[in-house]
């Protein structure tokens, strides 16, 4: 029977990749560090119930993404009926648009883009996490990036 490693070892082994994901979504600074801390706090609470042999890194990255989204939403400005004359767009608007674009992709596209572009895994290693083959995963990522670019261009044309 396999058991999961001690949680301290999990933090040491996966802490860097979780911080990289948080920083990619929130930018460097205290928000990314808060998301990292909240990720491992939530993971510590849920760790005893995690199935033995589960993909711990993928599980942690999912938690980190949710925590980053929570922080972005908490920092999102409240809509007003009328904007003041000197209204300035918040610096995170682009990040929220990026998250919306990511959310519109298929689950496979989101995961492949995350593993390859955010965590730095080569396409040859990603089938170990997601199944499939490197060529199909590369295609899924390319299609996802193309869709995100298209959405970005449409948003620019509207503004």
Where are these regions (language model features)?
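Structural recognition of an alpha-helix C-terminal capping motif at a helix-to-coil junction
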Residues: 34-41, 45, 54-66, 139
């Amino acid at each position: 029977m396999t058991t999961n490693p001690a949680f301290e070892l999990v933090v040491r082994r996966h802490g860097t990749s979780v911080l990289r994901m948080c920083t990619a979504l929130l930018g460097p600074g205290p928000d990314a560090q808060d998301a990292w801390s909240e990720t491992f706090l939530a993971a510590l609470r849920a760790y005893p119930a995690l199935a033995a042999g589960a993909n711990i890194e993928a599980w942690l990255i999912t938690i980190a993404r949710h925590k980053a989204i929570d922080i972005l939403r908490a920092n999102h400005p409240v809509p007003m009926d009328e904007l003041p004359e000197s209204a300035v767009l918040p610096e995170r608007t682009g990040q929220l648009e990026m998250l919306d674009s990511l959310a519109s992709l298929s689950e496979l596209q989101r995961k492949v883009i995350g593993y390859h572009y955010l965590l730095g895994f080569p396409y040859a290693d990603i089938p170990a996490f997601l199944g499939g083959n490197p060529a199909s995963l590369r295609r899924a990522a390319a299609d996802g990036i193309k869709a995100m670019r298209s959405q970005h261009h449409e948003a620019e044309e509207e503004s």
